[in-house]
Amino acid sequence: MTDLHHLSVHELADGLKNKQFSSHELVEHFANRINRLDGQINSFITKDFDNALAQAKLADKLRAKGDNRPLLGVPMAHKDNLCTKGVLTTAGSKMLYNFVSPYDATVVDSIANSGFVSLGKLNMDEFAMGSDNESSYFGAVHNPWDVQRVPGGSSGGSAAAVAAGFVPVATGSDTGGSIRQPASFCGITGIKPTYGRVSRYGMIAYASSLDQAGTFGKSALDCAYLLAPMAGYDPKDATSINRPSEDYVADILATKTDGKPLAGKKIGVAKAYFGAGLDSEVEKSIRTALAKYEELGAKIVEVDITDPAITLATYYLLAPAEASSNLSRYDGVRFGYRCENPKDLHDLYTRSRSEGFGAEVQRRIIMGTYALSAGYFDAYYTKAQKVRRLIVDDFKKAFEKCDIIASPTAPTPAYKLGESLDPASIYLLDVYTIGVNLAGLPALSHPVGQANGLPVGLQLISKHWAESELLKTAHIYQSHTDFHQAKADLVK
């Protein structure tokens, strides 16, 4: 059983059902692997192995008594901005370094009820602000494909843990590309659902109108297994939409993959996604993937979308503005980090926030506060909201010509740790992904090749509520290619 970490969720569920191994053996295998190798990756902030092993034993007992939940006893892990009762929830920040949540996020509760066993909490950029996972108070995460390189962010710990074979699937959150970009950098699959599809209750907020929880897995099918229990209406979340979700797993398993399975499907490609800044090797992999989609029956059509430079500017006005508001609650009084021996209330506020927040979070709070200030609110924030509406309209027009839009996920492969210290350069990594968040659309990234030995991801974007279409389309591609099965040296 030395290669259990190579198995898909589907294979793990079958193995448990057929008694090829127990949940306890499975959790023990992954825990031992994490203890042995995560020193090189730093993907976990909190290892909750004792509780996981207890849950695995319970899962085995329940299965023996006839509990037939297919995912009962399958391991996974959570991004550390999802509240977990009795377990540290830090959001990668000194501000919450010792915060133990008194309740579970709805997502955490739903996943546990489906039978999954959580192994712990995964590293992330502080308060989900970053694209490389170098801003975490708990140290940078390393990419399993090259431990000298970044895994992407902000869900870098989640992506790295799946790519390293520490867990078969993991949760993440995506505000401007924080699932899709690390999925691309780490050579795995990741999906951001439609805004409102998955509950945000219990997810520590960065930008409330943009944040959405999603999943990582080796394949589209693995992502579907974890997304299925997460999706659905939650009355505790005011942004949750009361709309039935599809049976993602059943839809994929019923999909025909032989012949020309994508016949009749139109995939839109915009010239704006292939401009300056796109690495030539990345573009080569993307073009090859699009040709494969054509071979599978899809028709490639040209569409127009908002200039990515405009979406980038819009996002970096709106997201920091919302962050400025959301993070004002961390004042050293109610919860979170509190400075020592404050001279007065003003000193308590000032020092607690300046000592508790890292440089990138402080930068975005300042940017957001400036955009919201009385003299600039209309010139910046209000105008950005109007542009956001136009971005939504442009996507609607594009989808009149196609079923799915394809683009590179990131303009480059993973870069070296510490290499891109200029914040503006890091912000540019989100250039292809942020428009999706501004429009509230679902999108997925799946691996389609390599650039200089590093993974490259293709982004697929669909209409609102069409997660199943995305997953089925990626599954068809993955049924005819093996890029999603490529393994980093750490995993072989």
From Swiss-Prot:
Gene3D superfamilies: Amidase signature (AS) domain. Keywords: ATP-binding, Ligase, Nucleotide-binding, Protein biosynthesis. Transmembrane segments: none annotated. SUPFAM superfamilies: Amidase signature (AS) enzymes. One of its GO terms (molecular function) is ATP binding. GO terms for cellular component: glutamyl-tRNA(Gln) amidotransferase complex. It catalyses: L-glutamyl-tRNA(Gln) + L-glutamine + ATP + H2O = L-glutaminyl-tRNA(Gln) + L-glutamate + ADP + phosphate + H(+). One of its GO terms (biological process) is translation. It is an enzyme of class 6 (ligase). It comes from the Bacteria. The active site is at K79 (charge relay system), S154 (charge relay system), S178 (acyl-ester intermediate). Its EC number is 6.3.5.7. Belongs to the amidase family. GatA subfamily. Allows the formation of correctly charged Gln-tRNA(Gln) through the transamidation of misacylated Glu-tRNA(Gln) in organisms which lack glutaminyl-tRNA synthetase. The reaction takes place in the presence of glutamine and ATP through an activated gamma-phospho-Glu-tRNA(Gln). HAMAP family: GatA. Heterotrimer of A, B and C subunits. PANTHER family: GLUTAMYL-TRNA(GLN) AMIDOTRANSFERASE SUBUNIT A, TRANSAMIDASE. This is Glutamyl-tRNA(Gln) amidotransferase subunit A. It comes from Moraxella catarrhalis.
